[in-house]
């Protein structure tokens, strides 16, 4: 069991022993450090707060700067919380966290925010088929059709699929295989795609199975 915070670098392809091309994602997982240790007696739950990267102090507001200095670490770019059962180590504030908690071939879950696509219609957002392309119709090709009932129920049901903001949601991709670990450069190569654009931050957690 292990967990760490990482930044998505991009995608590439690697070849396995069978000379098959495998799509992979490169993640920069570190340098990470513990910024706070939360205890059930004081905070109501047990967790580790993890930071990643080193940021110029001039670009950090005073409350966050004080938070980092209390832990005795340099300001980072991102902070995220992990439960103690996910990290499965005894750590103190200021302690470093690296890729030694993982091994090649291990399965992980990656949590991130998907790419935001803005306001989208029902054809793009929910894969609707649209209206008929015949009988002189001109403006019903990508329309949703009827969304309500008649006099009974006289309303549109909550949760009806309609146009709206698409993307920008919390996504978890499960059971991705670690292809390669490069501890000297804090790089992690995983099989397949992970959520979010380049340079977005993700949480990496070992699968519980």
Curated annotation (Swiss-Prot):
The keyword Oxidoreductase does not apply. Residues 128-163 are annotated as: Disordered. GO terms for molecular function: rRNA binding; structural constituent of ribosome. One of its GO terms (cellular component) is cytosolic large ribosomal subunit. Keywords: Ribonucleoprotein, Ribosomal protein, RNA-binding, rRNA-binding. Pfam families: Ribosomal_L3. GO terms for biological process: translation. PANTHER family: 50S RIBOSOMAL PROTEIN L3, LARGE RIBOSOMAL SUBUNIT PROTEIN UL3C. Part of the 50S ribosomal subunit. Forms a cluster with proteins L14 and L19. One of the primary rRNA binding proteins, it binds directly near the 3'-end of the 23S rRNA, where it nucleates assembly of the 50S subunit. Belongs to the universal ribosomal protein uL3 family. This is Large ribosomal subunit protein uL3. It comes from Chlorobium phaeobacteroides (strain DSM 266 / SMG 266 / 2430). The lineage of its organism: Bacteria, Pseudomonadati, Chlorobiota, Chlorobiia, Chlorobiales.
């Amino acid at each position: 069991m292990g967990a760490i915070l990482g930044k998505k670098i991009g995608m590439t392809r690697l070849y396995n022993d069978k000379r098959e091309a495998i799509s992979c994602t490169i993640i920069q997982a570190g340098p990470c450090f513990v910024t706070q240790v939360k205890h059930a007696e004081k905070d109501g739950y047990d967790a580790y707060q993890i930071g990643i990267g080193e940021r110029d102090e001039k670009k950090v507001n005073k409350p966050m700067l004080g938070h980092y200095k209390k832990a005795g670490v340099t300001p980072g770019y991102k902070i995220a919380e992990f439960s103690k059962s996910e990290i499965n180590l005894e750590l103190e504030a200021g302690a470093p966290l690296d890729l030694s908690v993982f091994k090649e071939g291990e399965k992980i879950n990656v949590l991130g925010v998907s790419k935001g696509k803005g306001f989208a219609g029902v054809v793009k957002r929910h894969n609707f088929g649209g209206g008929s392309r015949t009988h002189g119709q001109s403006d019903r090709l990508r329309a949703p059709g009827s969304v309500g009932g008649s006099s009974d129920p006289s309303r549109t049901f909550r949760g009806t699929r309609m146009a709206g903001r698409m993307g920008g949601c919390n996504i978890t991709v499960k059971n991705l295989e670690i292809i390669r670990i490069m501890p000297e450069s804090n790089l992690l190569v995983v099989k397949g795609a992970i959520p979010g654009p380049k340079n977005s931050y993700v949480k990496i957690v070992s699968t519980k199975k």
